């Protein structure tokens, strides 16, 4: 499962607005706040420069200087989450909520971190709180959809993804996961529409190409399926499933030499990824292609 992460630039634009609002709110200005805010802004610049560890240090120092400065905790959480440090990130988002109880984005990202840490029940509570505070927050609706999909509440997931699309129509991950649920529910035409929308938004969306190819393959449309699997592999050269699926198409077409070539690529990738089961499955298919 892929938990949604805003692109860094979008996060930064939101956070800069939040920081600006804090700077002009007299009730939030203390003797410590100006240097703390300076550190937050310094941290944001470091993130833009790709200096994540230095940014974390700046955000942490800002939070230490002014524990009530919510953007310091929030940015610290985002940076820690980029390093896949889920528990420290969740702790930072929680501190942001304590500092600013109406901070919907902090609730949404805390929910996302908890979901990524395999704690869907707590995640759902924080995501619902985010939506209560800010009903048009696409991030929260999207992650709530992921929770519902994990709970196999398929119609609930579709409803959450659809709402997320209403508020964040340009985010390809939402369309992709909507397509996944539609495909699981055998609503194939809706799945195709969703995957194509994801690809339109992000042409190199490997998983969307792959799922579209899988649908084409199941429908017996071998050439369109092969084209989709090729696009998936071009978008992500380490996508072993795309090579394996292309091998299945070549086998069905009777092009065994081509099948062996891509299946060997798939086997090598599965071995590199230490996926012994699929390495063995691919080896069996290779034997059939000889």
Q: At which residue positions do the language-model features occur?
A:
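TPR/TPR-like alpha-solenoid repeats
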Residues: 79, 113, 147, 181, ...
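Alpha-helical segment of the N-proximal tetratricopeptide repeat
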Residues: 34-71, 78-85, 112, 116, ...
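Structural signature of tandem alpha-helical TPR/SEL1-like repeats
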Residues: 49-61, 82-95, 117-129, 151-163, ...
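Helix-start (N-cap) detector for alpha-helical repeat units in TPR-like alpha-solenoids
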Residues: 36-37, 70-71, 104-105, 138-139, ...
